[in-house]
Amino acid sequence: MPKISVIGAGNVGATLAQRLIEKDFADVVMLDVVEGIPQGKALDISQSASVLGFRHAITGSNDYAETAGSEIVVITAGIARKPGMTREELLAINQKIMTDVVSNCLKYSPEATLVVVSNPVDTMTYLAWKLSGLPRKRVVGLSGVLDGGRLATFVARELGVNPSAVSPCVMGEHGGSMVVMPRFTLVNGKPLSELVSPEKADELAKRAVNGGAEIVAFLKTGSAFYAPSASVAAMVEAIFLGSGKVMNCAAVLDGEYGLRNIVLGVPVKLGKGGIKEIITLPLDGQENARLQVSAEMVKAQIASLSL
């Protein structure tokens, strides 16, 4: 049976494991360092099989050997962002975690595609790529799928349309410098830039940028996990099924958009083995300038890594 492993059984990891097993295209292994947590959550999820009708198995483990032969490994392990905590402050702790996770995952699944969710995700995706030694297209991070989902929600509410009618385009850092692209965000096929004023577009963009922090402020003791897990599940499905679907993801750039040796959110075509193609949009001067500013933010984070 094909296998997908989820590293980290916190809110994002466990909810993702649930979403993946309900899609029923592969067995799912949920791994965590805390004994009992992945086992208990996997057992709970497995007991919904007769209700939901999925046939594949979900298991929980503390042993990386259980992940052996995974086609895709999703890395959610890391501490959750707390109120007032920036993504940058997560870096030192999550770097150590990522180093251990990548080493163990590739020991048992050397052919796996890595999907990185741990924050700050652009920098963690870069770190996973460097640590793994994998080709750049076999390492991809959560970015614009989630940010775009947030944007689509607010655009849909503003215009009175179904969120599924919005095809969002959010590029750059998954963080405060992310770049919403109104010209490339489509609502029923029409550019957002033609449907709202520049001021309204900026207002919607700011709401999307602050979407994660807004949830953290409400929850007080945690961060978002429903939309993030749904976003990652969509990415995993596109990779596993080889759909060729275009999504905005954190990707290693090598000349695209004039950038090299950096991970940044850009449109990519996902398929078997990870990223099949990086889409280069015809950005105007202002759009490109904003993307370059966002890139500088990520470069500063990458420079602080201990590599």
Curated annotation (Swiss-Prot):
Question: Does the keyword Acetylation belong to this entry?
Answer: no
| Catalytic residues as annotated in Swiss-Prot or TrEMBL | H174
What is the annotated signal peptide range for this record?
none
Reaction catalysis annotation = (S)-malate + NAD(+) = oxaloacetate + NADH + H(+)
> What are the recorded Gene Ontology BP terms?
lactate metabolic process; tricarboxylic acid cycle
Q: What is its EC number?
A: 1.1.1.37
Where is substrate annotated to bind? R81, R87, N119, R150
Q: Which Pfam families match?
A: Ldh_1_C, Ldh_1_N
In its UniProt record, a GO molecular function of this protein is:
L-malate dehydrogenase (NAD+) activity
- Out of the domains of life, which is the source? Bacteria
Q: What class of enzyme is it?
A: oxidoreductase
| Record carries keyword Oxidoreductase | yes
Per UniProt, the keywords (alphabetical) are: NAD, Oxidoreductase, Tricarboxylic acid cycle
Specify which residues bind NAD(+) according to the UniProt entry for this protein: G8, A9, G10, N11, V12, G13, D32, N94, V117, S118, N119
Cited HAMAP family? Malate_dehydrog_3
NCBIfam families to which the protein is assigned, alphabetical: MalateDH_bact, PRK06223.1
Function in brief:
Catalyzes the reversible oxidation of malate to oxaloacetate.
Sequence similarity = Belongs to the LDH/MDH superfamily. MDH type 3 family.
> What is the protein's name according to its record?
Malate dehydrogenase
Q: Which organism is it from?
A: Dehalococcoides mccartyi (strain ATCC BAA-2100 / JCM 16839 / KCTC 5957 / BAV1)
Q: Please spell out the taxonomic lineage of the organism that makes this protein.
A: Bacteria, Bacillati, Chloroflexota, Dehalococcoidia, Dehalococcoidales
